């Protein structure tokens, strides 16, 4: 499952690492968009296969942030 950005913004903090086991609703990262902090959470459980962003990165709408399997 790909976790994607819904709007442009900046990554404030990444809360997971590759290999972490997640439950549905687990916090993956925090981003700032439109001067507001937004929590990005997993829609379903799984294992973090890949992180596509780091703290401080700028992201665009539709950009893949992480891959969960």
From Swiss-Prot:
Query: What's the main place this protein lives?
Result: cytoplasm
Identify residues that carry N6-biotinyllysine: 35
Q: What class of enzyme is it?
A: lyase
Which InterPro entries does its entry note?
Biotin_Carboxyl_Carrier/Decarb (IPR050709), Biotin_lipoyl (IPR000089), Single_hybrid_motif (IPR011053)
Tell me the ranges covered by the Biotinyl-binding domain, including all copies.
1-69
What's the EC number here?
Answer: 4.1.1.-
Would the keyword Lyase be found if you checked this record's keyword annotation?
yes
Under Pfam families, the record lists: Biotin_lipoyl (PF00364)
Q: Which GO terms describe its cellular component?
A: cytoplasm
Query: So what does this one do?
Result: Biotin-carrier subunit of the biotin-dependent malonate decarboxylase multienzyme complex (EC 7.2.4.4). The carboxyl group of the carboxylated biotin carrier is released by the membrane-bound carboxybiotin decarboxylase MADB.
Protein name as it appears in the record: Biotin carrier protein MADF
Which organism is the protein's source? Malonomonas rubra
């Amino acid at each position: 499952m790909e976790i994607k950005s819904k709007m442009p913004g900046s990554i404030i903090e990444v809360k997971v690492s590759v290999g972490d086991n997640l439950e549905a609703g687990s916090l993956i990262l925090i981003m700032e968009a439109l001067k507001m902090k937004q929590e990005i959470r997993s829609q379903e459980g799984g294992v973090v296969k890949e992180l596509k962003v780091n703290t401080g990165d700028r992201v665009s709408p539709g950009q893949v942030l992480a891959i969960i399997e």
